């Protein structure tokens, strides 16, 4: 009798371990798929007053002769006012794609513009920089590459005294970085990383936002993991970014959002996330999430989801690289308030941005995967029922909810007893009727784990026409193994 029981226990233990191994393999593939990058974009700073534009579109198509004339006046006008006026006219013309092409084809045009940019006339410098900014917004890589002679000067001016000028240079660099690998290749030896590291010390919010934008564009380059991110990790930038994301009265949502995306791209590269962990990325992000959840409760709609999304992604991806024992040493990551904060955001997303629900659920999955503490928090805070209410929303949401529930159930009989009796079984039975094979497969896995640890659930499954539900799935060949396993367990315990 003892030997038979030992053998049966070994078989069940192997079954649980095999289920866990399979799910971890699937989750590894999911994690890889979720290391998605935000689409690159360009930003345009235009401060034309209505009276300057005359109530009409500022973009003016200029011919070659007109471009030459404005360049000549900008370079050799009778006085500074005439030169500035010529640059303003040129800038408006450069808002038109055809004028941009005319400009870069014109011999000596960029040399003339760079000459004005490097002059000692502040107003002319500013207008020349605005002309470059218009060019940087082009979608043609040839236009961006035509701006190569100006990049070293734009970098130099990042150490200047005018915050407005620095902001303009940063957005221009960010736009150029997106469009051309040649630009990025030139900027690296010119010292873009040290220049950015100096910029992050700025007290000006607009400069910091512009820096976050430019840095995020640099981090999304295809060559970033090999050629860019290592030097960024060796600089003071990661530590300073995390400092700017610390919750408190000085936290600026716009700045924090830009640098949260920067951290996301660094983490997704998997170059050396140990550096971020050493600088306290996990506790900083966890505390920020707690702070944001409190703000969501106090204020209705302040655009917090724009910051919450990258913060959730950063935490989710970092947790996959942290051993469970190390995670347990982080006080902020042992706090059940983190689970409560996640559910505040899930409720917020449900009402305001349903598309962001998977972000919160993915973090909840990674928190509960290897942590009995967080599974206990889900149970002690009575959050299983709110979780079950998310099942009907979409297949993606349903899949993640089922995965989180598997994390709880696989922790053993003590956890399953706290789930039973309750609405779990009936909710999961409903998912067996869904058309998504992956979701149904995850439901079968959850039921198998539940029956192994809670035999009463298997008996209730039979009483609620569970076998009939399984028979309807017989044509799904890829589910046959799980269906047979579940039928055997149900029959054994029923």
Curated annotation (Swiss-Prot):
Q: Indicate the transmembrane segments per the record.
A: 338-358, 386-406
Q: Which UniProt keywords apply?
A: Coiled coil, Membrane, Transmembrane, Transmembrane helix
Coiled coil feature spans: 15-39
One example of the protein's molecular function in GO is: nuclear import signal receptor activity
Entry's localization field: Membrane
The name this protein carries in UniProt is Transmembrane and coiled-coil domain-containing protein 6
Picking any one GO biological process from the record gives: protein import into nucleus
């Amino acid at each position: 009798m003892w030997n038979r029981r030992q053998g049966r226990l070994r078989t069940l233990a192997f079954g649980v371990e095999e289920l866990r191994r399979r799910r971890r393999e699937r989750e590894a593939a999911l994690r890889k798929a979720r290391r998605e990058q935000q689409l690159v974009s360009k930003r345009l700073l235009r401060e034309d007053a209505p009276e300057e534009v005359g109530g009409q579109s500022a973009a003016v198509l200029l011919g070659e002769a007109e471009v030459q004339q404005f360049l000549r006046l900008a370079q050799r006008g009778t006085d500074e006012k005439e030169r500035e006026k010529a640059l303003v006219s040129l800038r408006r013309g450069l808002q038109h794609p055809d004028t941009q092409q005319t400009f870069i084809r014109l011999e000596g045009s960029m040399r003339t513009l760079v000459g004005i940019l490097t002059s000692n006339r502040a107003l002319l410098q500013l207008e020349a920089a605005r002309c470059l900014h218009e060019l940087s917004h082009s979608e043609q890589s040839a236009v961006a590459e035509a701006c190569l002679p100006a990049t070293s000067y734009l970098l130099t001016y990042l150490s200047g005294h005018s915050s407005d000028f620095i902001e303009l240079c940063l957005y221009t660099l960010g736009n150029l970085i997106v469009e051309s690998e040649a630009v990025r290749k030139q900027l690296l030896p010119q010292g873009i990383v040290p220049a950015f590291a100096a910029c992050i010390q700025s007290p000006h919010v607009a400069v910091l936002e512009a820096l976050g934008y430019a840095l995020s564009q640099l981090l999304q380059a295809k060559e970033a993991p090999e050629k860019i991110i290592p030097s960024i990790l060796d600089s003071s930038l990661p530590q300073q970014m995390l400092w700017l994301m610390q919750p408190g009265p000085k936290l600026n949502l716009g700045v924090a959002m830009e640098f949260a995306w920067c951290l996301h791209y660094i983490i997704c590269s998997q170059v050396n996330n140990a550096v971020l962990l050493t600088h306290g990325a996990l506790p900083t992000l966890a505390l920020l999430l707690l702070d944001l959840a409190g703000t969501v409760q106090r204020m209705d709609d302040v655009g917090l989801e724009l910051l919450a999304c990258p913060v959730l992604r950063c935490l989710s991806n970092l947790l996959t690289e942290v051993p469970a024992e190390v995670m347990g040493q982080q006080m902020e990551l042992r706090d059940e308030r983190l689970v409560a904060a996640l559910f505040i955001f899930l409720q917020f997303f449900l009402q305001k941005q349903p598309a962001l629900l998977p972000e919160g659920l993915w973090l909840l999955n990674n928190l509960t995967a290897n942590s009995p503490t967080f599974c206990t928090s889900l149970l002690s805070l009575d959050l299983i029922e709110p979780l079950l209410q998310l099942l009907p929303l979409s297949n993606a949401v349903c899949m993640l909810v089922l995965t989180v529930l598997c994390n709880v159930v696989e922790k053993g009989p003590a956890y399953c007893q706290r789930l039973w009796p309750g609405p779990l079984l009936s909710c999961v039975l409903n998912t067996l009727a869904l058309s998504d094979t992956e979701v149904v497969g995850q439901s079968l896995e959850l039921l198998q784990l539940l029956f192994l640890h809670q035999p009463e659930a298997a008996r209730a499954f039979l009483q609620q026409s569970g076998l009939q539900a399984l028979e309807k799935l017989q044509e799904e060949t890829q589910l046959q193994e799980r269906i047979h396993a579940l039928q055997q367990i149900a029959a054994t315990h029923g």
